């Protein structure tokens, strides 16, 4: 296995932290810091408004290890796959703002959803995004109606390929821009929904090989869903992606998915049926940052991950 020698952005060893996506108030942040103590570390969330970011700054500055684009929050997610120049231009502008945010907070990594199988701007609000993802051009590729889940053949479809190729080309250029500023751009594997790009271990390996400056964010919950939808061994899929040596950060959360059921719950790592011990053993050995992205029991989940990172029993 290749080793990732500067997982926390060139600023020291890999760390355990938590995404601020699960914290909606200053009180929640303060409570988490009180529970975890001086080792509390954070990933800025794409849901943080400029106002909330400014309010939270005194609490979290010096504790931020990564940011999730776009931050502060924007009306649309970046869509580097679009053939519409105006959509791409706005995406790059928003990514430049996110880079400024990361630098301002001392974050060494920015996590990105690379793009979508459409030329349209993709709303960051799920309520606004869902009608776009339900458009007729996506219906032929839906294998499981509940969740609009695709199959493994989707990545080879004529509708998918040109969007993936455009996204790859722009990711390389953007990663090099970020690297010049001392920040690593990490592309996240998404859940296997029609309209989303980059779900499978094979695609993540392709991204990892594109350029030395392009990194990965391994979302273990998303890959869990994909393993059921695509029919591959989940733990082997994790090992495949980790084995690239390019995983800068891991998003850690569980869900209630199973064969025929696909749920991106972002629930506690102790979700019944989720292979927690095996997952944490694999990711803890990677030296990637370990970021809890659950939306419940954040301190409890952080302590579980801290134990795993230290090689201690977690249950």
Task: Give the location of each predicted region.
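Short, glycine/acidic-enriched loop or turn micro-motifs at the edges of active sites
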Residues: 71, 191-192, 222, 296
